Amino acid sequence: MQGLLLSLSLLASAAVGVLASDDLKIDVTLPVECDRVTKKGDKINVHYKGTLKSNGEKFDSSYDRQSPFSFKLGAGMVIKGWDEGLVDMCIGEKRTLTIGPSYGYGDRNVGPIPAGSTLVFETELVGIEGVPKPESIVTKSATDAPESTASAKVVEKVASVAKQAAEVVETIIADTDDTQEHNEL
């Protein structure tokens, strides 16, 4: 019985820790249909506007420069929130990424961004190097849009942590489920 209670406690703690995470929230604001989505390793072109969640103050915008930002996705050239939040995106798609400090700049001041800030980026995928731009952008209805990548990652993480917790519980039960008496002491 103690083993069961311990296992349930471990699973609950792990799940709460994962679900309480505010590292990355992805809202698809303009879902688009396409044959080819972004993947890690792609060089992509993105328009964006970055604001501080705390006060809505804009700290950067590629629209102001009239030039999209280009980088290799998943290569660590940008903050983790971008490397993960812009995967599986179609050309023409728009997303709002809400990025917690651990997926942003952490405890560092960076230009006008205070340490520990949660960032909000309105993003638009303008292009993927080597992938022709579609002649027209076909939007999806909100009901056709897939679940956000962040939600899928949370489910995946909870499953992973639950599996690890179950393995620990099995080990504990195996170690304490010894019915043989040890009178050596």
UniProtKB/Swiss-Prot annotation:
Disulfide bonds: none annotated. Keywords: Endoplasmic reticulum, Isomerase, Rotamase, Signal. Its main location: endoplasmic reticulum. It is found in: Endoplasmic reticulum. Residues 1-20 form the signal peptide. GO terms for cellular component: endoplasmic reticulum. Pfam families: FKBP_C. It catalyses: [protein]-peptidylproline (omega=180) = [protein]-peptidylproline (omega=0). It is an enzyme of class 5 (isomerase). GO terms for molecular function: peptidyl-prolyl cis-trans isomerase activity. PROSITE patterns: ER_TARGET, FKBP_PPIASE. Inhibited by both FK506 and rapamycin. A motif (Prevents secretion from ER) lies at residues 182-185. The keyword Protease does not apply. PPIases accelerate the folding of proteins. It catalyzes the cis-trans isomerization of proline imidic peptide bonds in oligopeptides. Belongs to the FKBP-type PPIase family. FKBP2 subfamily. This is FK506-binding protein 2. It comes from Podospora anserina.
